[in-house]
Every structure is written in C-alpha cells, then in structure tokens.
Amino acid sequence: SIFVLPDLPYAKDALPKISAKTFDFGK
C-alpha cells in the first residue's frame, strides 16, 4: 500500500499538485 502524507493539511484535495512525503508499506 502507498501512504501519502502531505505537508499541508488541505493538500489531500490536491495531492497531484503538491510535494508529498510518500511511504511505501509492503510494496
């Protein structure tokens, strides 16, 4: 699973547009 933690609290609505921290668990 891929988990993306955006730097901005509202960024979840704009994930394709922001630079997010991405964590890959279990590939």
Curated annotation (Swiss-Prot):
It catalyses: 2 superoxide + 2 H(+) = H2O2 + O2. Coiled coil: none annotated. Its EC number is 1.15.1.1. Binds 1 Mn(2+) ion per subunit. Keywords: Manganese, Metal-binding, Oxidoreductase. The keyword Metal-binding applies. Its cofactor is Mn(2+). GO terms for molecular function: metal ion binding; superoxide dismutase activity. Belongs to the iron/manganese superoxide dismutase family. Destroys superoxide anion radicals which are normally produced within the cells and which are toxic to biological systems. Homodimer. This is Superoxide dismutase [Mn]. It comes from Desulfovibrio desulfuricans.
